From Swiss-Prot:
Protein name as annotated: Phosphoribosylformylglycinamidine cyclo-ligase
Entry EC number(s): 6.3.3.1
Homology family: Belongs to the AIR synthase family.
Pfam families documented for this protein: AIRS, AIRS_C
Lineage: Bacteria, Bacillati, Bacillota, Bacilli, Lactobacillales
Organism: Streptococcus pyogenes serotype M5 (strain Manfredo)
Chief localisation class: cytoplasm
Amino acid sequence: MSEKNAYAKSGVDVEAGYEVVERIKKHVARTERAGVMGVLGGFGGMFDLSKTGVKEPVLVSGTDGVGTKLMLAIKYDKHDTIGQDCVAMCVNDIIAAGAEPLYFLDYIATGKNNPVKLEEVVSGVAEGCVQAGVALIGDETAEMPGMYGEDDYDLAGFAVGVAEKSQIIDGSKVKEGDILLGLASSGIHSNGYSLVRRVFADYTGKELLPELEGKQLKDVLLEPTRIYVKAALPLIKEELVNGIGHITGGGFIENVPRMFADDLAAEIDEDKVPVLPIFKALEKYGDIKHEEMFEIFNMGVGLMLAVSPENVNRVKDLLDEPVYEIGRIIKKADDSVVIK
């Protein structure tokens, strides 16, 4: 018995792995940007930092996955957008530190290589990279029979960005009186899906719930996470924002305090938060306490900006979208986030 046949009998399809590599090359090519060195398939991805033109570069890195949202992608057999979620979760964290994302690497683990399915996943990764302006310089697909079921896979991503040292956003510039501006989310994004799946466990996904304005439930649940890089970068370059919060797992309560020092707090006007229909549906069908919703979900705001009052109009002018003035920074009394 040859080694090749022995490996196949253990559940690893080497030929399918080669096919995956060939299928994804055209998607990787879409993400090319200045600074990329070498080609996909080497032992390490390379990037020439001098091409960024940054004078005092500080590298900022991020890694994340998409949690159990993957289980819905598998359940509904829709794999072409989940990669965008993975990119978004990484690059949105990087932009919150004031850095421009440069490149991205993904890791896919599966029980059985399915070249068509994995190409769909990577096509979504590439689309996310294009939206974020980052290069996909590394991809690892691990076939692990016995670790995962044949139809199962997991997806993780890694991103690196660069910031001018003087433009790093670390919370130290946020001050009392700053205005909190919210940028709309596209939906649930990629957090809270263990609860989401429990709430809708008995649904097929084809339902047209009255709250969802004519959209099928599965389409709303799998709406890809919005990528904020191109919206936020011009604001960072002009030094118009004092703090940025990426509203992910833990919702407002956990993420907003990460924007500022411990002696400050955020006062949020709930009436000005653009709550999306899916959150109203989750609260209703899941019998979730209203205040708990803000502890779990983004509630319609995926990125929050702390801006000096004199810069608010300029920020609104630069953002080609609705901007929601949802609160302000105050001196901390008890809680770090006060929702009124």
